[in-house]
Amino acid sequence: MSSGGLLLLLGLLTLWAELTPISGHDRPTFCNLAPESGRCRGHLRRIYYNLESNKCEVFFYGGCGGNDNNFSTWDECRHTCVGK
């Protein structure tokens, strides 16, 4: 196969991996956790995955502790937890 063909194949595989939906079996288990504000008293706007609505939603994080269902951006949450 030519180098151009290999690059095309690599590009298609990368695109497929990005666009393939996340199933419940592929979703990290921490996505199923309820949002946890943690033990500190900050008021940071963060994003968590809501298993019931299958959407990323806002919660307020204290700044320390908590769990891994805690994202800085909508895109990070969607890419990690939301099935498309």
Curated annotation (Swiss-Prot):
<keyword id="KW-0325">Glycoprotein</keyword>
<keyword id="KW-1199">Hemostasis impairing toxin</keyword>
<feature type="disulfide bond">
    <location>
        <begin position="40"/>
        <end position="64"/>
    </location>
</feature>
<dbReference type="InterPro" id="IPR050098">
    <property type="entry name" value="TFPI/VKTCI-like"/>
</dbReference>
<feature type="domain" description="BPTI/Kunitz inhibitor">
    <location>
        <begin position="31"/>
        <end position="81"/>
    </location>
</feature>
<protein>
    <recommendedName>
        <fullName>Kunitz-type serine protease inhibitor B4</fullName>
    </recommendedName>
</protein>
<feature type="disulfide bond">
    <location>
        <begin position="56"/>
        <end position="77"/>
    </location>
</feature>
<comment type="function">
    <text>Serine protease inhibitor that inhibits plasmin and trypsin.</text>
</comment>
<dbReference type="GO" id="GO:0090729">
    <property type="term" value="F:toxin activity"/>
</dbReference>
<feature type="glycosylation site" description="N-linked (GlcNAc...) asparagine">
    <location>
        <position position="70"/>
    </location>
</feature>
<keyword id="KW-0722">Serine protease inhibitor</keyword>
<keyword id="KW-0964">Secreted</keyword>
<dbReference type="InterPro" id="IPR002223">
    <property type="entry name" value="Kunitz_BPTI"/>
</dbReference>
<feature type="disulfide bond">
    <location>
        <begin position="31"/>
        <end position="81"/>
    </location>
</feature>
<dbReference type="GO" id="GO:0005615">
    <property type="term" value="C:extracellular space"/>
</dbReference>
<dbReference type="InterPro" id="IPR020901">
    <property type="entry name" value="Prtase_inh_Kunz-CS"/>
</dbReference>
<dbReference type="Pfam" id="PF00014">
    <property type="entry name" value="Kunitz_BPTI"/>
</dbReference>
<keyword id="KW-1015">Disulfide bond</keyword>
<feature type="signal peptide">
    <location>
        <begin position="1"/>
        <end position="24"/>
    </location>
</feature>
<feature type="site" description="Reactive bond for trypsin">
    <location>
        <begin position="41"/>
        <end position="42"/>
    </location>
</feature>
<keyword id="KW-0800">Toxin</keyword>
<keyword id="KW-0646">Protease inhibitor</keyword>
<dbReference type="GO" id="GO:0004867">
    <property type="term" value="F:serine-type endopeptidase inhibitor activity"/>
</dbReference>
<keyword id="KW-0732">Signal</keyword>
<dbReference type="InterPro" id="IPR036880">
    <property type="entry name" value="Kunitz_BPTI_sf"/>
</dbReference>
<comment type="similarity">
    <text>Belongs to the venom Kunitz-type family.</text>
</comment>
